[in-house]
Regions:
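Active-site-adjacent helical/loop segments in soluble small-molecule enzymes
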Residues: 45
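C-terminal intramolecular chaperone/auto-processing assembly modules
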Residues: 2, 9, 51, 55-115
């Protein structure tokens, strides 16, 4: 859910730019159906924003896990967590751009004064 009233311990994602550098965007073909997709790799998301990664168990032959049936555990990604990271990366980038623009304007003024 996105409603602030339903959340506790709200914190801005720190070091978002450094975190996002641990991830890439990919295109890929899903093994189970051969269809093309785009997205991220859960293991990379686990490094960057572990709060966005969960897991699921897939049972053989569509089983339900009853009677001690073993399945394989796979990671899943909640893309709302990745979106939150991307929003914070955009904000950090905007802050850096603004600082560089201000520095550039100051340097131009100093250069004009020298000329």
């Amino acid at each position: 859910t996105s409603d602030r009233d339903l959340k506790d311990n709200i914190q801005v994602i720190d070091n978002a730019t450094n975190r996002i550098r641990k991830m890439n965007g990919y295109t890929y073909t899903l093994k189970e159906n051969g269809m093309p997709y785009a997205g991220v790799i859960a293991q990379e998301a686990l490094e960057a924003i572990p709060e966005s990664v969960g897991s699921t168990i897939k049972y053989r032959d569509g089983g339900s896990g009853s009677e001690g049936e073993e399945g394989e555990r796979y990671y899943t990604v909640d893309y709302s967590g990745v979106t939150g990271l991307l929003v914070q990366v955009a904000r950090e980038s905007d802050d850096r751009i603004t600082a560089l623009e201000e520095e550039n304007a100051e340097l131009r003024q100093r250069l004009s004064a020298i000329e």
